[in-house]
């Protein structure tokens, strides 16, 4: 149970970081 929770937490963190980087790159390109 703990392994599944930590895995989903890591997946969520990775997805958040990726989306933030993607949005940042798009904003830089727009400017």
From Swiss-Prot:
Function: Component of the cytochrome b6-f complex, which mediates electron transfer between photosystem II (PSII) and photosystem I (PSI), cyclic electron flow around PSI, and state transitions. PetL is important for photoautotrophic growth as well as for electron transfer efficiency and stability of the cytochrome b6-f complex.
Entry's Gene Ontology BP terms: photosynthesis
SUPFAM superfamilies: PetL subunit of the cytochrome b6f complex
Membrane topology of this protein: Single-pass membrane protein
The protein, known as: Cytochrome b6-f complex subunit 6
InterPro entries named in the record: Cyt_b6/f_cplx_su6
Pfam family, one: PetL
Compartment(s): Plastid, Chloroplast thylakoid membrane
Species of origin: Nandina domestica
